[in-house]
């Protein structure tokens, strides 16, 4: 269960603007379905396109740029997140952004993959990811406005099951379709159609109004700014921000492990990658999300997140030192995927425990942007490490950063604890 501190803070954070509070929450499986397009577009890039990159003349470092282009907008999305809070309703934003994301995945699949088209493809990926970020924002805003404090762990699990399950769906199914269908664009068309089907789950959600409709546009902007400043002036909000910006529990190695040249170190091919980094990984990661949500019902999310970060570092070390066989690639990829699910559920619980309900899209995506920053730069660094020193060194590099991040956070707890900030 959440601590009384979390419950009191979450309740008080949402109290001033009663129009944003929704008394009846849907079953959390709704968040799973609604969040699938967000995860699936990311999986299409990080698994399907990334695996094929080195087969089409790109280096491992260049292949890492594909996921880097996607994550670039994901750690900058705090800039446009306030638009979701102060303009259209969350439902309208979801339908618009999901439709445009469907167009985006079609465009990505239609661009030929190779050194000569890399620049164009990176631009398409970045634009599609920018639009896709609004899919996530709209769901996060509705979810934050309907989740009672004592359900944070449970909701976090279902929510991240949609994110990471979607990554597995977009990656595994996307790669299989790209390899089996006669034309690459057909895979994008099928993925886009699946995105649009997820809109049907909106009928089970309340239509949370934009803050501008409740208080006027200028007042809404002021409120969003005030809510954000108030959150970051608390010990809980500041510590959550510090933990998010550190390279803890990122799962960044997954993007590198999907590349054909890296997977070949263990003797793994397209089928193993599609299953272990795609479809099966999605299922295993979803299981990790539920285990992480259960854990966060019993531990403070900060404690759970830090511990999971150390566990993920240990998994990377073990994968790096074990024999380089296909069976080891399969086993450790699945263990790694489970640990990533734990980490992502703990991240969502950490954020929901800190943001309350007002200006939810903005506040959630400030934390998400902070968390995506280390995922972005560490992913690029791991690609370079794999290029220069090999797959084993890449995994040990990730583990080193993960342990260092937890040490820095432990020291930050001492410093913030001595401050005069509100709890």
Label each residue range with its predicted role.
Residues 99-115, 310-324:
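C-terminal ends and interior cores of transmembrane alpha-helices
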Residues 86-99, 297-309:
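Cytoplasmic membrane-interface "Motif A"-like loop-to-helix N-cap segments
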Residues 9-25, 209-239:
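Juxtamembrane intracellular "pre-TM" segments in multi-pass secondary transporters
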Residues 13-74, 239, 243, 249-263:
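Helix-loop boundary and gating motifs at the non-cytosolic
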Residues 76-89, 287-301, 386-387:
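Helix-to-loop junctions at the C-terminal end of transmembrane segments
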Residues 302-347:
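C-terminal transmembrane helical hairpin of 12-TM major facilitator-type secondary transporters
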Residues 134-147, 342-356:
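Intracellular juxtamembrane helix-capping segments at the cytosolic ends
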Residues 154-172, 368-379:
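Glycine-rich segments within core transmembrane alpha-helices of 12-TM secondary carriers
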């Amino acid at each position: 269960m959440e601590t009384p501190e979390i419950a009191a803070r979450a309740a008080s954070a949402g109290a001033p603007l009663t129009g944003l509070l929704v008394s009846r929450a849907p079953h959390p499986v709704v968040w799973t379905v609604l969040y699938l397009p967000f995860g699936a577009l990311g999986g299409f890039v990080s698994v399907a396109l990334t695996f094929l990159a080195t087969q089409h003349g790109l280096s491992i470092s260049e292949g890492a740029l594909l996921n880097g282009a996607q994550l670039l907008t994901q750690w900058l999305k705090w800039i446009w997140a306030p638009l979701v809070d102060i303009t259209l309703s969350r439902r309208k934003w979801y339908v618009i952004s999901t439709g445009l994301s469907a167009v985006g995945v079609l465009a990505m699949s239609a661009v030929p993959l190779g050194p000569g088209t890399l620049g164009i493809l990176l631009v398409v990926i970045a634009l599609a990811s920018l639009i896709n970020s609004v899919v996530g924002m709209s769901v996060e805003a509705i979810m934050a406005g309907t989740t009672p404090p004592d359900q944070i762990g449970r909701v976090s699990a279902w929510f991240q099951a949609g994110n990471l399950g979607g990554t597995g769906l977009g990656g595994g199914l996307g790669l299989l379709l790209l390899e089996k269908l006669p034309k690459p664009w057909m895979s994008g068309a099928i993925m886009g159609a699946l995105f649009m089907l997820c809109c049907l789950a909106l009928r089970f959600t309340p239509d949370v109004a934009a803050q501008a409709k409740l208080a006027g546009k200028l007042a809404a902007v002021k409120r969003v700014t005030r809510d954000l400043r108030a959150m970051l002036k608390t010990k809980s909000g500041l510590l959550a921000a510090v933990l998010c910006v550190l390279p803890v529990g990122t799962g960044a190695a997954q993007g590198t492990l999907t590349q054909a040249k890296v997977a070949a170190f263990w003797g793994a091919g397209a089928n193993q990658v599609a299953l272990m980094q795609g479809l099966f990984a999605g299922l295993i990661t979803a299981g990790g999300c539920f285990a992480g949500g259960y854990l966060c019902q019993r531990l403070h999310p900060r404690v759970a997140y830090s511990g999971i970060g150390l566990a993920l570092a240990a998994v990377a070390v073990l994968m790096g030192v074990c024999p380089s066989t296909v069976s080891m690639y399969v086993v450790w990829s699945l263990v790694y995927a489970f640990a990533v699910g734990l980490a992502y559920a703990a991240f969502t619980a950490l954020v929901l425990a800190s943001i309350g309900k007002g200006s939810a899209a903005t506040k959630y995506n400030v934390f998400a942007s902070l968390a995506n920053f280390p995922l972005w730069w560490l992913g690029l660094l791991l690609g370079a490490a794999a290029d220069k020193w090999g797959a084993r060194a890449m995994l040990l590099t990730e583990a080193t950063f993960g342990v260092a991040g937890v040490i820095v956070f432990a020291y930050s707890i001492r410093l913030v604890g001595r401050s005069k900030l509100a709890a």
